[in-house]
Swiss-Prot record:
Alphabetized PANTHER family for the sequence: TRYPTOPHAN 2,3-DIOXYGENASE (PTHR10138:SF0)
Annotated organism of origin: Mayetiola destructor (Hessian fly)
Stated name of the protein: Tryptophan 2,3-dioxygenase
InterPro entries noted in UniProt: Trp/Indoleamine_2_3_dOase-like, Trp_2_3_dOase
Molecular-function GO terms, alphabetical: heme binding; metal ion binding; tryptophan 2,3-dioxygenase activity
Cofactors required: heme
Length: 389
C-alpha cells in the first residue's frame, strides 16, 4: 500500500538522494549567488609575491577581511535603524524591528571580540616575518570602521589625535573623504536617540511633569537622610555621612540644573542633551510599565554596543602589545599601542550617560506614583510618540 503522505516533493527528494543534482537552469547556484569566486580568491599574500611565503600572513588577511565584511553588515543595520528613528514621530510598532537589529549588531560585535584569540594563535615572531610587507597599511585606514564610529555617534572633537586628523590617512581618495564627511554631517544614532528620548511621554510640564516630581522626591529623600545623619552620635561617622550626602546633592544638581548639565557637556563628560537625560531617567524608573518595556531594552542594547566596542578595543590593544610591544610605532605611522590604549577612554563611549544613569536612581518607594491618566497612557499601545510643544 502506498504511503498516503508521500508527495511529489518527497519523490523529487528521492531523485536528489540518488545523485541527480539540479542544474543551473533552476536558478543561481550557491557559489554564484554568494560570488564566492571573488571572495575566496581575494587573498593576495605579499610574502608570496616577494617569493618568501609566510604561512601566517594568510590568517592575518582572512581575519581582517572577515572584520570588514562584518563592519559592512553593522553599517547596513545601523543605517536602517537610523532611518526608522529619523522621523518627526517614531512609529512604536517598529520598535521591535529596531530592537532586533540592535541585538544583531550586539551579536556581531560579540563575534568580532572572539576573533582576536584566533589572531593570537600567531606568535610575535610569526608576525614579524611578514610585518614589513604591511607598511604603510594600517588598521587606522579602515574606512568602514571610521564610518561605523561616526554613524554610532563618535564626534571628531572627542577623538584622540595621534599625529594627524583621522581623515588624512585616506589621502586623495575623494570617494572615501566624501563618505566620511557625509557620515559626520548626517545625524548619528546617538543624535537620533536623543531626539527620541526628548519626546518621552510624561515629560510634558502640562501633563505628568515627571521631572518636577522626581526633583522634589530626590531632595525630600536627601533632606530626610541628612536629618538622620545629624543625629548620629559618633562624630567621625556623622561627618562622613554628611559629606556623602553633600556629594550626592552636588551630583543631582547636575541633572536638575541645565547650566550645570551643559558645563559637563562642554567638557565632554556628558553626551546627552538635558531633555534626553530626563527621558532616559523616566524610562529607566518606569521600565516595568508596558509602554516603556521595549524602550528600556533599547537603551540596554545601546549600552551593550558600547560595551562590546570597548571590549574589542581592549582585546585589540592587548594583542598589539603582545605582537609589537608598547614602544614601536604602528605600520601606518601611529604610536601603535599608546594610541590604541587611549581609545579605551570614556570619550569613545557614545552611550556614556546611559551607563551613568544608575548614579541617579532612587528607591522604588520614592519613585513618583503615576497619575491615573499617565498610567492609562503607559498601558495603551499607541503607535507614535508625538513631540511635545
Amino acid at each position: 500500500m502506498a504511503c498516503p503522505y508521500r508527495s511529489s516533493a518527497y519523490t523529487n527528494g528521492d531523485h536528489a538522494q540518488k545523485g541527480e543534482v539540479l542544474g543551473s537552469e533552476m536558478g543561481m547556484l550557491y557559489g554564484e549567488y554568494l560570488m564566492l569566486n571573488q571572495i575566496i580568491n581575494s587573498q593576495r599574500m605579499q610574502s608570496v609575491v616577494s617569493n618568501r611565503p609566510v604561512h601566517d600572513e594568510h590568517l592575518f588577511i582572512i581575519t581582517h577581511q572577515a572584520y570588514e565584511l562584518w563592519f559592512k553588515q553593522i553599517i547596513y543595520e545601523l543605517d536602517s535603524i537610523r532611518d526608522l528613528f529619523n522621523t518627526i514621530t517614531v512609529d512604536e510598532s517598529r520598535t521591535l524591528d529596531i530592537l532586533k537589529r540592535l541585538n544583531r549588531i550586539v551579536m556581531i560585535l560579540k563575534l568580532l571580540v572572539d576573533h582576536i584569540p584566533i589572531l593570537e594563535t600567531m606568535t610575535p615572531l610569526d608576525f614579524m616575518d611578514f610585518r614589513g610587507y604591511l607598511s604603510p597599511a594600517s588598521g587606522f585606514q579602515s574606512l568602514q570602521f571610521r564610518l561605523l564610529e561616526n554613524k554610532l555617534g563618535v564626534k571628531q572633537e572627542h577623538r584622540v589625535k595621534y599625529n594627524q586628523k583621522y581623515q588624512d590617512v585616506f589621502g586623495d581618495d575623494a570617494k572615501s573623504l566624501d563618505m566620511l564627511t557625509a557620515s559626520e554631517d548626517e545625524p548619528s544614532l546617538c543624535d537620533l536617540v536623543q531626539k527620541w528620548l526628548e519626546r518621552t511621554p510624561g515629560l510634558e510640564e502640562s501633563g505628568f511633569n515627571f521631572y518636577q516630581k522626581f526633583r522634589s522626591n530626590v531632595y525630600e529623600l536627601l533632606d530626610r537622610e541628612e536629618q538622620k545623619a545629624k543625629m548620629q552620635p559618633l562624630e567621625h561617622i556623622r561627618n562622613y555621612q554628611l559629606m556623602d550626602i553633600k556629594k550626592r546633592r552636588d551630583v543631582y544638581h547636575t541633572i536638575f540644573n541645565e547650566d550645570a548639565h551643559e558645563a559637563l557637556v562642554s567638557r565632554g563628560e556628558r553626551k546627552f542633551s538635558y531633555k534626553a537625560m530626563q527621558g532616559a531617567i523616566l524610562i529607566t524608573l518606569y521600565r516595568d510599565e508596558p509602554r516603556f518595556s521595549q524602550p528600556h531594552q533599547l537603551l540596554n542594547c545601546l549600552m551593550d554596543i558600547d560595551s562590546f566596542m570597548t571590549k574589542w578595543r581592549y582585546n585589540h590593544v592587548m594583542m598589539v602589545q603582545r605582537m609589537i610591544g608598547s614602544q614601536q610605532l604602528g605600520t601606518g605611522g601611529s604610536s601603535g599601542y599608546q594610541y590604541l590604549r587611549s581609545t579605551l577612554s570614556d570619550r569613545y563611549k557614545v552611550s556614556l550617560d546611559l551607563f551613568n544613569l544608575s548614579t541617579f536612581l532612587i528607591p522604588r518607594s520614592n519613585i513618583p506614583p503615576l497619575t491615573e491618566e499617565m498610567s492609562n497612557q503607559l498601558n495603551t499601545n499607541t503607535r507614535t510618540i508625538k513631540p511635545t510643544n
